[in-house]
Regions:
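Short beta-strand->loop structural element characteristic of the AMP-binding/adenylate-forming
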Residues: 1, 58-61, 88, 110-117
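ANL superfamily adenylate-forming
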Residues: 1-41, 149
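Adenylate-forming
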Residues: 27, 90, 118-119, 132-174
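Phosphate-coordination loops involved in phosphoryl transfer and adenosine-cofactor binding
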Residues: 41, 82-83, 158-159
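Conserved S/T- and glycine-rich ATP-binding loop of Class I adenylate-forming
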Residues: 44, 50-53, 86, 92, ...
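Conserved AMP-binding A3 loop
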Residues: 45-69
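Conserved G/P- and acidic residue-centered "switch" motifs that form tight phosphate/ATP-binding loops
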Residues: 53, 109, 166
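Conserved AMP-binding/adenylation subdomain of ANL enzymes
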Residues: 68-85, 93-134, 144, 148-150
Length: 174
């Protein structure tokens, strides 16, 4: 990995869980066995959980078509180029992180840089090597990022799209 602290974090991760197969070995068997039906656009792809802003968090059933439609919407908004870099600091188990991080990066064929947690220091170090062109985040992350970048005299001009969600974006951050 290009950033030392990311390399060190990866090295601290535990080894392969028992009874799992390495990803590369799974790729050899990519075609689905004919005994199993191929998933359709209407089939359940995953359960994502809401943040509970209107009550208790809920598990939302999303189909393959839902995921693709959300990613395609993002693609239409952003009109990606050939060299997009998306920083993913949002949890992938929520719709916002899944859609504007993981799903859109696949649709747009963008490079996806996933951060294990919101770590402004780590993000700014990574930006010295690879500036994101797309940064989906929440207002508190933008506030901290702007404050720290200003203190350290780091330009954020390479970010073409800073997509905000989950709460109101204060006018002073726009």
């Amino acid at each position: 990995l290009p950033v030392k602290s990311l390399r060190e974090s990866r090295e601290k991760l535990e080894g392969v869980a028992r009874n799992t197969k390495p990803w590369k070995s799974l790729l050899k068997f990519a075609p689905l066995d004919t005994r199993y039906p191929r998933p359709t656009a209407q089939d359940l792809a995953l359960l994502l959980y809401t943040s509970g802003t209107t009550g208790a968090p809920k598990g939302v059933m999303l189909t393959h078509r839902n995921l693709e439609a959300n990613a395609r919407m993002g693609e239409e908004w952003i009109q990606p180029g050939n060299d997009e870099v998306i920083y993913s600091v949002l949890p992938l188990f929520h719709a916002y992180g899944m859609t504007l991080g993981l799903s859109i990066s696949m649709i747009c064929q963008a490079r996806l840089v996933i951060f294990p947690t919101v770590d402004i220091d780590l993000m700014l170090k990574a930006m010295k090597k690879t500036m994101p062109t797309i940064l989906p985040a929440v207002p508190p992350v933008y506030r901290r990022l702007l404050d720290e970048a200003k203190k350290r005299n780091i330009s954020l001009q390479g970010i073409r799209y800073a997509v905000s969600g989950a709460m109101n974006l204060p006018h002073e951050l726009v």
